[in-house]
């Protein structure tokens, strides 16, 4: 047996070689939480429990320490790596393994993307008995400094010498003592320590539990969740910090609807989709994609797959602030955007006017988790659908399309592009679209929207004759 390899691994202890008491395990695969998966062997050489090992990679032989035992499986963390994987790499971030923001920095980027592609394929097969006719090339881009949205926890910790501002520690309610972050844009990472110092000076430092940040093309917004009003001295400190770091402060005293800009007032968050000549203003609490560079590529691919023509009528479901709706309106005759949030549909309408495509768009607010075949009928006939649901997926929409197909009572879109942030709900909905609504799964592929995490974003194309 080879010597233990002291590599940087989340949760690992590398005080020395593996002891005789630490069990040894060969890792076969990764699960959806980026844990190594292997099967223990009992004293008779027979397969035993499945072991999920944090910090282990496929192809590795490790020793491990279990922290949760169940009849059929155990959860564990790496103790030592006896045979490292060729996919293992040294994490760039000094706080990896403690901070819960990333789970895959120890895995080569190409391997990260390949594993996510396999997760997508496995979900489609195991949950829906489907294989795509083609697997699209993965969409990927910069792997560092990409995270343009984040929610940071603020905690006054006397034992740490003051205020902490950062992500939670891995599987913990504690806040990581982080002074930089490699996945945040460099200017935001450099702001973490000054932000701590700012909060320490505020009168409400122990009554401000959260800071939400959103990076736009011209300004970075920081939303302070304030449980009590700030005083005049606080206002001065915030203005000075905003001027020094070129940020805009917003205050949120209660729920999301209470968010309002504080200072400065003459700037506006936005992002752009240059390929389609779109400028998209948004509020810092609106849903927008975390990774602006990848979003541009994703929108371009989605529209090329959907292939809208000038005479087409297109339905954009879960349209948000118009991320796909507005580019579609540059190409199609009419685009109807449906979204569950009235706030977001109002923003989408304003954005359509801002970009001069309001003559080709209309928007409505509907609960798409309860939509029926009758609801789709009432909207009229559409040539194509674009569907971009949250993690819960588009079950009601898929069921409604299946019902229409089986009843033969209405036209169905010839093509559907489905953008997913959860491969299991995509697979579930794909099963309905293919097995019950008569579509073919023409292609699918991953979108590496969140490098160094186990999050799997994907895109799929369905067609029906």
Curated annotation (Swiss-Prot):
List GO molecular-function terms, semicolon-separated: 4 iron, 4 sulfur cluster binding; iron ion binding; RNA binding; rRNA (uridine-C5-)-methyltransferase activity
Q: What is its EC number?
A: 2.1.1.190
Positions with a binding annotation for [4Fe-4S] cluster: 93, 99, 102, 181
Q: Where is this region: Disordered?
A: 1-20
Q: Which reaction does it catalyse?
A: uridine(1939) in 23S rRNA + S-adenosyl-L-methionine = 5-methyluridine(1939) in 23S rRNA + S-adenosyl-L-homocysteine + H(+)
For the ligand (S-adenosyl-L-methionine), the binding residues are 289, 318, 323, 339, 367, 388
InterPro entries documented for this protein: 23S_rRNA_MeTrfase_RlmD, MeTrfase_TrmA_CS, NA-bd_OB-fold, SAM-dependent_MTases_sf, TRAM_dom, U5_MeTrfase_fam
Sorted alphabetically, the Gene Ontology BP terms of this entry are:
rRNA base methylation
Domain named TRAM is located at 12-80
Q: Where is the active site?
A: 421 (nucleophile)
Q: Which UniProt keywords apply?
A: 4Fe-4S, Iron, Iron-sulfur, Metal-binding, Methyltransferase, rRNA processing, S-adenosyl-L-methionine, Transferase
| Pfam families assigned to the protein according to its UniProt record, in alphabetical order | tRNA_U5-meth_tr
UniProt function note: Catalyzes the formation of 5-methyl-uridine at position 1939 (m5U1939) in 23S rRNA.
Q: What is this protein called?
A: 23S rRNA (uracil(1939)-C(5))-methyltransferase RlmD
Species, as recorded:
Burkholderia thailandensis (strain ATCC 700388 / DSM 13276 / CCUG 48851 / CIP 106301 / E264)
Encoding gene, per UniProt annotation = rlmD
